[in-house]
């Protein structure tokens, strides 16, 4: 991934860590974070299902307009922390 792409993901991760951003987190931004962490996406109607080899957790997201649901933002944040998916980056 290009450096500019990594910088964008770092900024999105900073927003994801903030509880203030849960209600106004763009669905496409949450999707970009998961894809940058090597999750595979499968779409079935309005459900975007993300899986990753080596991780048993399945992430199921449904957009509400252009936003992600707040509880799903929290789930993604906790999944990333629990599995230490950010490598050398600050994961809170």
Describe each region flagged by the PLM.
Residues 7, 11, 25-28:
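N-terminal amphipathic/basic helix or basic patch
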Residues 12-17:
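Short, contiguous pre-domain boundary segments
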Residues 64-91:
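C-terminal structural segments of small proteins and small subunits
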Residues 33-59, 64:
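A short, structured beta-strand/loop element
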Residues 1-9, 85-92:
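Intrinsically disordered, low-complexity and often Lys/Arg-enriched segments
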Residues 44, 55-58, 83-88, 92:
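Basic, low-complexity intrinsically disordered segments
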Residues 18-37:
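Polyanion-binding surface elements
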């Amino acid at each position: 991934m290009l450096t500019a792409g990594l910088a964008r993901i770092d900024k999105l991760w900073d927003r994801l860590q903030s509880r203030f951003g849960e209600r106004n987190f763009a669905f496409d931004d949450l999707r970009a974070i998961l894809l940058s962490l090597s999750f595979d996406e499968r779409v079935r109607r309005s459900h975007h299902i993300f899986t990753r080899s080596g991780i048993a957790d399945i992430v199921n997201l449904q957009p509400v307009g252009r936003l992600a649901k707040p509880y799903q933002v929290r789930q993604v944040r906790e999944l990333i922390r629990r599995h230490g998916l950010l490598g050398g980056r600050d994961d809170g």
